[in-house]
Amino acid sequence: MAAALATSFFCGAAPARAQVTSEPSAVVFPDPAKFATGLYTEGEFGGLWFNGPAGNDIGAGFAVGARVGYDFVRFFALQAHLVGSTHQTQGDSAVAGQLLQMYQATVEAKATLRLVQLSFFAEGGLGFARMSSNLLYALGIARYRTGLTAGGGGGVDYHFLSRHFSVGLRGGYYVLTEVHNSRDGMVTTYLRYTF
């Protein structure tokens, strides 16, 4: 062992010499042209609240949703959106403290402005909203459990260096036609995968 150490000490390698022939290359920014386009899916979660008469009797709730869409060109897409949320009635009525779920299904158009890894978008569409029970009828706010909904929103999307994944934050505002003069607002964060 001592002989091996002595040999490596006295017969060690010569000092290394390196030659620099050019400056190091700059950081390579991602090329948005290489980001995947076409069919995509999104999973989202966040909060949903009611405005108008329904907002006085129904508290804000947790929302979970999904989107499936198709980018026809880099700046325009069509998508189907499903979201469900759970709420609790509030106030001093006989139905206070009861749980209520709302389900919304919409078909939306989406316009996007891409700036390297960031993109800003606006979206809007039409669809249906359905309540899980007749609590709103008991409160005198709605006649039917199912009705039309229309609205829109927008947000920001951050694309990773991977060509398939991005994350984002979006907000939306929808009119509920069967809930007297009421609307719902939603803020969600999402993960997107483009095939």
Language-model segments: residues:
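Gram-negative and organellar
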Residues: V20-F29, F128, A150, G154, ...
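Outer-membrane beta-barrel biogenesis signature
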Residues: A13-E42
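Gram-negative (and chloroplast) outer-membrane scaffold detector with strong preference
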Residues: E42-G47, F62-L139, G147-A150, Y158-F160, ...
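Solvent-exposed loop/turn segments connecting transmembrane beta-strands
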Residues: G52-F62, S93-V95, L176-D184
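Short coil/turn motifs at beta-sheet boundaries
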Residues: K34-A36, G59, L100-M102, Q117, ...
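Internal, hydrophobic beta-strand segments that form the core of beta-sheet-rich folds
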Residues: R170-G172
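Bacterial N-terminal signal peptides
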Residues: A2-G12
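Short glycine/proline-enriched turn or capping motifs at secondary-structure junctions
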Residues: H164-F165, E178-T189, Y193
